[in-house]
Amino acid sequence: STPREDIGASMLITEDLSPKVNVPVEVVPMEELEKVLSSSNNGTIVTSRYFLQPLEKVAKQYGVRAIAVDLSDFQKELTILKKLSTGSCVGIVSISPGLLRAAEVIIHSMRGSELMLMTAISDNSSRLLSLLKASNHIVCDGPSLSVVENTLLKNRSQLMRLPQIICAENYLSTETINQLKKEIGVIN
């Protein structure tokens, strides 16, 4: 669960967890969580550390657990970005506005103004197209990859060059997924 304004983060968590835990995983915005829990007698709330404190109160009220998951360290992607030539234009595409904001801060702290950064939510087609036209490299999350690839295919004639696509395979760290599996009792 995350706030409605960044439900994309919940969707990324769900995308990583669903195939790895053999229990139903449902995306519920924080604003609707009490309503959902009032009609259910069990469950586990999974969120990022940023939202754990308010969700622990809700969990306690309804007798369920709230567990924070840790994000990937994105070392593969950051290593690639560290090696890019000064002046390169990098596009970041995600379903999560929170992830985009965090990525911008991290990349700026790492490279300063050496790289030109552009960001787009994957469902904002006009902004995405502008980003694809300008960028040498695109970093995207898993759910955005097909949108990026389809937009590139549809608009190839408008592009001077095809950008290199770097897809972040995991949103959550492997360790946090394994820990969560232990917590909920689904270790293989």
List PLM regions with ranges.
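C-terminal regulatory/effector modules of DNA-binding transcriptional regulators
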Residues: 1-188
